[in-house]
A protein has these predicted regions:
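PLP-dependent class I/II
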Residues: 1-198
Length: 198
């Protein structure tokens, strides 16, 4: 929170929370989310909650929806079918507005106008949303013991940590890992040079 607070200025209008996180795979605890919500309240910021990985959780990690915590600030939550339901080609998602909507009437009106003028949903995919959300949750077969995503996470994490000078925290959610390179072994000056050296 100290880093977020240090980077907040009078020009800061919103905060983005990706939970589970891309690229680290972190799943934020309730206290962290409460602190973010309180910070947003103190600075009158919108909260944008990207929760596309909310069902991809490992090792009993718990996803807490930001909208359930940020009751005093406008919280715009994004989700969709592409990750947990493996339907990326459907291009089907949604957003939920929760919290204090009274102070955001103009913003909400703008979203309504934009959706009426410029956006056209994938109608067949819209019908799939109800079935996906209310039906059998096949993602569980992939994230529980013996599941492909869990096993791939465990193997990738072990392989990364077996490389001298590379360490990685085991992700609690999503489908990413964020390794750390020991600067004593890998004297990388910047990420562009690292890619060029590879």
């Amino acid at each position: 929170m100290e880093d977020i607070a240090a980077k907040t200025t009078s020009k800061t209008k919103g905060i983005v929370v990706i939970n589970p996180n891309n690229p680290t795979g972190a799943v934020y605890k309730r206290k962290v989310l409460e602190d973010i919500a309180e910070h947003a309240k103190q600075h009158n910021m919108l909260i944008f909650a990207d929760e596309i990985y909310s069902k991809i959780l490992y090792d009993d990690a718990e996803h807490i929806p930001m909208g359930s915590i940020a009751k005093d600030q406008l919280c715009i939550t994004f989700n969709g079918l592409s990750k947990a339901y493996r339907l990326a080609g459907f291009r089907s998602g949604w957003m939920i507005l929760s919290g204090n909507k009274l102070d955001a009437k103009d913003y909400i009106e703008g979203l309504d106008i934009l959706s009426s003028m410029r956006l056209c949903c994938n109608v067949p995919a819209q019908h799939a949303i109800q079935t996906a959300l209310g039906g059998y949750q096949s993602i569980n077969e992939l994230i529980l013991p013996g599941g492909r995503l869990l096993e791939q996470r465990d193997i990738a994490w072990k392989m990364l940590n077996d490389i001298p000078g590379v360490s990685c925290t085991k992700p609690a959610g999503a489908i990413y890992m964020f390794p750390r390179l020991d600067p004593e072994i890998y004297p990388v000056k910047d990420d562009e040079q690292l890619v060029l050296d590879l």
